[in-house]
Amino acid sequence: SEKILPGSGLEHESLDTTHFSVADKNGNIVSNTYTLNSGFGSGVVIDGTGILMNNEMDDFVSAPGVPNQFGLIGGEANKIEPFKRPLSSMTPTIILKEGKPIYATGSPGGSRIITTVLQFLLNTLVFKMEISDATVAPRIHHQWKPDVLMLETGFDIQHASKIESLGQKIYF
């Protein structure tokens, strides 16, 4: 960890986000997503605790139109200013039915969290897939900038070829 300096980024999105959902016998549900944002967070450890500080400040735009460490391009609305929260993809979700919690989910995955959670919910609640099948189902992701459709391994190649023939850039 001595080689990791504050603000150091990783070449690829890291595995430093986690999500957990828990429920108790009384029907209380928690959906929690936590992130360091990149390997070793900001690289700053609170003296005497071993606690790493995250680097969520990277979720702000340092300059409109300039990509952050994950290649996300932000605009004027997400620039750093006092009393603001940065745009975040974290999507801890609790589904209610008649005012009572019935379902909790979320995911790690950086910019892909929102589309991952949406596709998981569609697969389980609308298409009635088993949770285990929905968890491993290949997903698609597009975030506007960069204009690339990301397809996970296992996505039907024939569908991908058809989409590509329409002029859409695809990344597997």
PLM-predicted stretches and their roles:
Residues S1-P6:
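Amphipathic alpha-helical
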Residues G9-F172:
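Proteins synthesized as precursors that undergo proteolytic processing into mature forms
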